[in-house]
Structure formats: structure tokens, C-alpha cells
Amino acid sequence: MDADYIVSGAASCVAMIGHDYDHLFAEDPEWLERSRRVGKRVIDLTTFLDRVARLPAGCLDAGPFHPVTYHHFCQSHNVLKIREEPKRLITEVMGMELREMNEASTCCGFGGSVSIDHPSMAKHIVERKLANIDDTGAPLVITDNPGCILHLRGSVDASGRTVRVLHVAELVDERLRQLTDPA
């Protein structure tokens, strides 16, 4: 493969490929080397847009938009150390108001199989996350992991809330559509 980067919209996959494949292939030198070559090129979408594409300030500013809050997916925050990139993308590149959420990097309750294996615990965790989202007053939650999106959307729907939950890529898409078709 000749690509410089392998961009993923799932930060959990980036963490797995970039950090855990060494353990999986430790007994097989050929596959270990292959996994390391891939691991060096895999990057999450938010980091790619921030560090590689280097989108200039305001290039996705399509005018007024609802304030947003950001849920830091556990592995994005703790393993990949993605902290400031989403904030810059939202505030500087898109020109949006970011309302910081209490416990933004605390698990939403999805946690891989936690929501399946321990549903009552997952429900308690997501209720706390939803309360923190409510406290921001933002009608839109952005995150970078499909598992969190699935769990948060389901919990928002079940609770009757009207908050929208979007992946970073979905937000970028909305802003691009607003720029190309402002009507």
C-alpha cells in the first residue's frame, strides 16, 4: 500500500491498530512487521484534519450555528492523547461556540461490551453523561467514536431528549453543505 495515511473515523480502531497490534502479533515476526507498518500510517479523522490537512481558520465557518459540546471518547483522550484537536476544529476552523462539558473525557457507558455485559452500570454512567450534556445547554454533542454515538443516541432517544449526537465527520459534512448550499 502506497498511501501515506490510513484515516479512520473510529478512534477505537486507530487505538487498536496503533497500540494493540504489537501484542496480537508478538509471536509472528512477519505479521508484527506488517502491523507496525500499518500502525505508523493509521490516524484518526480529527487529528488528520488538524495536523495533516491543517485546515485554515474559518474555512468551514458557514455562519451562525447552534452551540456544541464535545464528548472525548475514552481511548481518544487516554490512549491517543487527542485533547485540543477537536476544540480547534470546532472553534477555529468551523467558527462554532464550544461549551465545555463537565467530565467530558469520562466514559459514556458504552465501553466496548460494557453496555451489553453490564447494562445497569452502563445506564447509570450514561445518565450522568446526559446530565453533563444537559448542563451545557448545547443542543448538539460531537464525538469521534461510533460506539459512543450509538450509545449516546440510543440513550438520548430513550430519555426523550432532543439533543443531537453527531460524529465529527457528520459535523464537517453539515458545515460543507451549508457552505455549498446556503439556502
Positions of predicted regions on the chain:
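Iron-sulfur cluster-binding electron-transfer modules in prokaryotic oxidoreductases
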Residues: 1-183
